Amino acid sequence: MEVVSKIDQENQAKIWKQIFGFAESLVLKCAVQLEIAETLHNNVKPMSLSELASKLPAQPVNEDRLYRILHFLVHMKLFNKDATTQKYSLAPPAKYLLKGWEKSMVPSILSVTDKDFTAPWNHLGDGLTGNCNAFEKALGKGIRVYMRENPEKDQLFNEGMACDTRLFASALVNECKSIFSDGINTLAGVGRGTGTAVKAISKAFPDIKCTIHDLPEITSKNSKISRDVFKSVPSADAIFMKSILHEWNDEECIQILKRCKEAIPKGGKVIIADVVIDMDSTHPYSKSRLAMDLAMMLHTGGKERTEEDWKKLIDAAGFASCKITKLSALQSVIEAYPH
C-alpha cells in the first residue's frame, strides 16, 4: 500500500474540511437557537458545563451532547474554554450572537441557514445545463411567489436583510459622510425591505428629506410611496438602492438604472449599495461575497458583480461616470453620475 505523503495528507484534510463545511453553519444556528451566548453573557462569569446546561432555556439538557456541541464551537473560536477550570466564556466574535443590540447578527444567521432558503443549494449544478431556477425546483415556485404565500418566511428574510443593513448603515454614515454632503437635499430610497438604511441616513443627516418607496414600514419623519421601479423612479437629488440590483440580471438592472437616471436632476446621482467582488482571496469578506453571488444565482437569477462589471453596467445605462468606495462592510458604495 502506498505511503501517504505529508502533502497528500494535507490535501485530503482540506477536502474533508470542505465536505463538512455545512457543519459550521448549522452548529452556529444551533448555538443561536439554544441561546448559549445569551446564557453565558447573562451569567457574567465563566460557566462550567453543568452550570451552563442548567441555565439554558431548553430543559432538560443532555450534558454529553451539549459538551460535544461546545467542543465544536470552541474549535470555531466562538467560545473559550479555560484549560484549568474547564469553564466556558464568550470569545470576541460571540457578541454578534447576542440578541437585542444593533449589531446582532442573529437574524442573518437564522435567515441564511433556514432549511427552505438552503434547499436550492442542492440544485446548484442543475442550472448549468439549462435555465433551471434552483429555488423553484427546490420549493415548487419562484422566490417572489413563495414569499407572498409564506409571510413568516418573508418576515424572516426581511429581518435578516435589516440585520445586514444595520451593519452596513453604520459603516456608511461613518465612513462616507462626503457622499451625502455635496448638494443633496432630497433622497429617495427604492427597494424591498424595512427602510433600515434610509432611516439611518435620515438620522445621520437630518437636513436631507428622505422618502421610502415600496417599503412596508416607515418612521414618522419619512414618507412612503408605492412604485414599480421598472416603470418609474421617484424624483430626488439622490436615488438610494441597497441590495436591489443584485437580484436582477444585467438587462433588468439597466432598465432600473435608466429609470433612475431619468428621475435625478443635473448634479444628482444614484447611490448603490451592493457587493463588489474582488479577486483578493485574502480579504476577510472575499468568501462571503462569492457565496452571496451563488446565493443570488440560486434564489433570484441575479448576481454579484466585480468592479469592472459595475462600470460596464452603469455605462450601458447611459451614465457618464461612477465612483466605487469600499467600506468595512460586506457591501461597497457605487455612485453613478449622469453628467
Curated annotation (Swiss-Prot):
4Fe-4S among keywords: no
Q: In which pathway does it act?
A: Alkaloid biosynthesis
Its recorded reaction(s) are: (S)-scoulerine + S-adenosyl-L-methionine = (S)-tetrahydrocolumbamine + S-adenosyl-L-homocysteine + H(+)
Task: Please list which residues make up the signal peptide.
Answer: none
Similarity field: Belongs to the class I-like SAM-binding methyltransferase superfamily. Cation-independent O-methyltransferase family. COMT subfamily.
PANTHER family this protein is in? O-METHYLTRANSFERASE (PTHR11746)
Protein name per the record: Probable scoulerine-9-O-methyltransferase OMT3B
Origin organism of this chain?
A: Papaver somniferum
- Taxonomic lineage of this organism? Eukaryota, Viridiplantae, Streptophyta, Embryophyta, Tracheophyta
Q: Which gene encodes it?
A: OMT3B
